[in-house]
Amino acid sequence: QRDRLIEDPSLIPSAVEESLRMFPAFAHFRRTASCDTELAGQTIRQGEKVVMWYVSSNRDESRYEEPDRFDLRRKAEHQAFGAGGRHFCLGTALARLELKVMLEETLARYPRIALAGTPAHVQSLFVNQLKSLPVTLGAPAAA
């Protein structure tokens, strides 16, 4: 996939969206029902706690073909920043821009960057965060 991004940098925004789908910053979010409602045949009473697991919804087999495969051509639909409305992440545009610039600059400077070990994750049920990501940079691109 790295080579495809180098050959066609127009795919970088797709890589950003697919990364956000597969690796959202937060694993879940909890809300309190403000009124009685029904969701997918399940009654939810006012005051009950409801948890939305981003890591599950973003890999829902009924919604995504091969949900555990990173696919640069996948349609950009995910809940990494919420589902809109009052509880939508205000930092969405900045987060996307930061990821886009990071990918553009890293791939331009180090086109042979590669994974050099197993990523270590922070042990948390709430945040989806890396503790370490071993990589080899390879030789810098010619200036």
Language-model features and meaning:
Residues Q1-A143:
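Cytochrome P450
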